[in-house]
Amino acid sequence: MNGLFVSFEGVDGVGKTTQVERLRAYLEAQGRTVVVTREPGGTALGKAIRQLLLHGVDGGAVDIAPRAEALLFAADRAQHVAETIRPALERGEVVITDRYLDSSLAYQAGGRELTPEEIRSLSMWATNNLLPDRTYLLDMDPALSHHRLEHAEDRMESAGDDFQSRTRQAFLDLAAAEPNRFRVIDASQSIEAVWAAIESDIKELA
C-alpha cells in the first residue's frame, strides 16, 4: 500500500489539531497505520528548536533575525523529514502533519517580509523536494481565530493583527497557486461541517 502524506495549515486557532485527530481516527478505522506529527517540534531536535522559536532563549523574549528564523525552521523540517516523515511513507503509512513548509512560506515570506522564492528554495532543499499529497487549509479571519486560543500567546501568535492578516492572505495565495494539492475549507463553520468536507475529500485519496 502506498504511503500518503497530508498536511494541515492555517493561522493559529482555526482548529487544526481537532481535525488532525478526526482524520487520524477515520483512517485508522479504515485499517491504515497513521503517524501524526507537527512542525516545529516533530523530533527531539525539533522540540528544542520549537522551544527556541516560540518562547525565546531560557524563556526570555529574543528578537530572532528573519534569516536566522528561516534557517531554524528549515533545520527542524530537514530532521523531521529524514527521521519521521519519509521513513513512514516508505513503510506505506499515512503521515498527517500539523503544519509543514507552507507555514514557513506564509509566516516567514508573507508575515516577515522575506521573499517567497528564498523561503521556498530553502524549504525544498531541506525536504529534498517532498510535498504533501494533500494540504487542508483551514481558513478563518484571524480576528475570529484569535478568540479561540486558550493558552498564553507565543512569539508568533503575539505578532499582531496585521501580521496575522498578511499570513492568512499568504496561505490563500499559496492555495490558489497549487489547486491540485490544496483544499481550502471555511474554518468558521462548525467542527462537524469542517470534518465533513475533509472526509468527503480524503475518500478520493485513501
Curated annotation (Swiss-Prot):
Binding site for ATP: 10-17
GO CC annotation: cytosol
Swiss-Prot/TrEMBL catalytic activity: dTMP + ATP = dTDP + ADP
The keyword Thylakoid appears for this protein: no
UniProt-recorded Gene Ontology molecular function terms: ATP binding; dTMP kinase activity
Record InterPro entries: P-loop_NTPase (IPR027417), Thymidylate_kin-like_dom (IPR039430), Thymidylate_kin_CS (IPR018095), Thymidylate_kinase (IPR018094)
PROSITE patterns tied to this protein: THYMIDYLATE_KINASE
Keyword terms, alphabetized: ATP-binding, Kinase, Nucleotide biosynthesis, Nucleotide-binding, Transferase
Biological process terms in GO annotation: dTDP biosynthetic process; dTTP biosynthetic process; dUDP biosynthetic process
Any Pfam family hit: Thymidylate_kin
Enzyme class: transferase
Domain of life: Bacteria
Enzyme nomenclature, EC number: 2.7.4.9
Keyword Transcription regulation found: no
Family: Belongs to the thymidylate kinase family.
Entry function: Phosphorylation of dTMP to form dTDP in both de novo and salvage pathways of dTTP synthesis.
Name of the featured protein: Thymidylate kinase
